Structure formats: structure tokens, C-alpha cells
């Protein structure tokens, strides 16, 4: 049986990690655990020119750190992520692979100069975590704007999409997890 391992990447809010476990179990119907001792320091992935962290490099390091893990690995951090061809990303995943990473950096209201909204920010994090893990199960971006697998290039798009898989994506996920 497969499982999901949540890996803290400094800095990270442990309460956010704990709040993710149960909803992720409900979304994927597999056990979720949180790595309690093997934290990842993302400083190796810092691009000092951009003042951002390369999400692809973080995924590679996650895979190096947990080579024997037989499931999906989700890194969670609060640093600003990028891939070289984009200004920023909320997260990144290996398509039909093992690892993904999500950042809360641009999901927080404070980033936009607004007051914190923990409930909204928690919902955003869950949507992006489910989305990136969906990619690790082989799901691609969905055209259904209500589906959690719909691509989001802004926080407004994260807010607009749903928290669940549409029927087609759920069917693909079920096929993937039953293999």
C-alpha cells in the first residue's frame, strides 16, 4: 500500500503540516505521515540574484534524502519558489513520479499587504498540496476550472478552483492508485 510523507522544509509552520494530514488522507485514500526528524534546509537551492529558491533543486534533494521511501513525498516550505522559466510557482511536482514541493509564501495574505487569514491560507495550501500530489499520481492540468487540478498562475485562480477532483480526474486517480 502506498502512502504520503510530508517533509518539513525550513522555515515551516508545524501546525500547517498537521492540519494537512487528514484532508490529504481523505483526498487520496492512503495514509499520510509527517517526517518528524529529517528536516530539509533549502539554502542550497537559493538563487541569490532572484532571492528565490529553485523548486526543481528542492525536489532532487527530497529524492536524495528519502531514496528508499515507497510512496509519495510532499515537501512544504514558506520560502519563495521558482522554476527558471517562470517568475514564481506555488509548487512543483514530478509528473507520475515520487516527489512534490509546495510553498505557502505567495499563498499568504500578508504577501499582498493584507491581514492574515489563516482559514483562507490553509485552504489555499490544501488545494496546492492536493494539486501537486495529483501530478505525482500522473494527473495533468484539467480544463475544468472547478477541479483542483486546474492550473493556477495567481492566488485568485487558487481561490476560484475547487478543493476536490472533478469526476474525470478522480477516475484517473483511482486508476493510478489501484495499479
Q: Where do the language-model regions lie?
A:
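A structure-centric signal for secondary-structure junctions around beta-strands
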Residues: 1-3, 70, 96, 163
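Fold-level signature of zinc-dependent metallopeptidase catalytic domains
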Residues: 2-12
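Generic structural signal for residues positioned in beta-strands
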Residues: 5, 73-75, 100-101, 148, ...
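Metzincin-family zinc-dependent endopeptidase catalytic domain
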Residues: 10-129, 140
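The catalytic-center signature of Zn2+-dependent metalloproteases
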Residues: 112-179
Amino acid at each position: 500500500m502506498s502512502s504520503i510523507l510530508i517533509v518539513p522544509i525550513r522555515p515551516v509552520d508545524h501546525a500547517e503540516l498537521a492540519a494537512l494530514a487528514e484532508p490529504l488522507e481523505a483526498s487520496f485514500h492512503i495514509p499520510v505521515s509527517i517526517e518528524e526528524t529529517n528536516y530539509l534546509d533549502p539554502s542550497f537551492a537559493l538563487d541569490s540574484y532572484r532571492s528565490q529558491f529553485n523548486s526543481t533543486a528542492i525536489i532532487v534533494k527530497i529524492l536524495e534524502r528519502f531514496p528508499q521511501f515507497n510512496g509519495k513525498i510532499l515537501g512544504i516550505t514558506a520560502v519563495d519558489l521558482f522554476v527558471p522559466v517562470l517568475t514564481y510557482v506555488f509548487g512543483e511536482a514530478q509528473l507520475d513520479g515520487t516527489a512534490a514541493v509546495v510553498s505557502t509564501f505567495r499563498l499568504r495574505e500578508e504577501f499582498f499587504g493584507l491581514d492574515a487569514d489563516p482559514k483562507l491560507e490553509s485552504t489555499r495550501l490544501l488545494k496546492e498540496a492536493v494539486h501537486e500530489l495529483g501530478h505525482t499520481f500522473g494527473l495533468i492540468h484539467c480544463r475544468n476550472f472547478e477541479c483542483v487540478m486546474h492550473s493556477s498562475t495567481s492566488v485568485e485562480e487558487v481561490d476560484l478552483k475547487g478543493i476536490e477532483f472533478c469526476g474525470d480526474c478522480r477516475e484517473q486517480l483511482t486508476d493510478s492508485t489501484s495499479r
